């Protein structure tokens, strides 16, 4: 398995630093021992800079989402207003084919001028070209063995170009991303 990568300013960069186990241990202590596998899996793909840029409350929300997505909630969307319409949007959601395109398209259509992004997945590197049917078979096998679904944790920064209040804009964005995630979770391929 290759080294994890994250996307920053359009360049895939290797993640050479790791999240300290003490952070994972603190999060598991708050969520319960049954969360250890899901939390460790999610945080194993994050760079320490991603973690350092996140507040303790945000880290707890991401850890909780690692346990709850998609069984209890379709996805977690966190929008933080930085200044003068600049926002940071962080998404924890199930991993599925073409998700990056769907998310960035929705962000753009919602009025976010994306300036940078970090993209992480617990799925590891793609095994090469797979058909949609192959992906569905792999998911069915994972489901039958009880293996947790792969997750993404993506962070985008940019400027909201609509005239809407940021809180109103964020509420609409959260609902739209949840709707898209619910549609993908149905896993109904076209033409079958």
Question: Which residues does each PLM region occupy?
Answer:
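Non-catalytic interaction/regulatory segments
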Residues: 1-192
